[in-house]
Regions:
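A recurrent domain-boundary module in secreted/ectodomain proteins
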Residues: 129-156
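Short, solvent-exposed loop/turn segments at secondary-structure junctions
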Residues: 3, 37-39, 111-112, 125-126, ...
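Helical hinge/lid and interdomain linker segments adjacent to catalytic or ligand-binding clefts
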Residues: 1-48
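Acidic-and-aromatic substrate-binding clefts and catalytic sites of carbohydrate-active enzymes
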Residues: 8-11, 110, 136-138
Length: 156
């Protein structure tokens, strides 16, 4: 993998980090989800500072127990596909992300209780998932989770 490919697929390029920082500092709310939002941003001090200072999460490793596809949060248990298959977008090693500052955990992988998602409420709000939102298997669960996220963003 050459440097240009790695830069092209970077979760948050330097330019994107500046835009997101400015957006959040002006009171914007942001939802981030993906299998590599922690691991991809853990390589340099600058990237770690961005995720911790702006998005309010840190990286704690990847979930390696392939037998677990359950995630608990928002009062329910949801499932994501972990093993490659022909029907779903599989997530073999989703990221375990932890809250920093006054952020708090909102989802945990089960079993094991590693943090799968965090939320932050300050002058702006973040909601970050260590797995892709679109990988939630049940359409009903996706709708309920999204309603919860939007409710968090709009509550006074």
């Amino acid at each position: 993998e050459d440097a240009s490919t790695k830069a092209y697929y970077k979760t948050f390029s330097s330019a994107m980090q500046r835009i997101i920082s400015s957006y959040c500092q002006s009171g914007g709310n942001i939802l981030v989800s993906g299998a590599y939002v922690g691991s991809d941003m853990n390589g340099t001090q600058g990237n770690r500072e961005f995720t911790q200072r702006v998005l309010k999460y840190g990286y704690q490793g990847s979930l390696t127990d392939k037998n677990s596809n359950r995630i608990n949060g928002l009062g329910r248990t949801i499932s994501i596909p972990r093993l490659p298959n022909e029907n779903n977008y599989a997530i073999p090693a989703p990221d375990c992300i932890v809250p920093v500052d006054s952020a708090f955990p909102v989802f945990t992988y089960a079993p094991g209780n590693q943090s799968a998602g965090i939320a932050y409420k300050g002058n702006y709000r973040t909601f970050v998932l260590g797995f892709p939102f679109e990988s939630i298997l049940s359409e009903a669960d996706r709708a309920i989770v999204m309603a919860g996220i939007l409710g968090f963003f709009t509550q006074k």
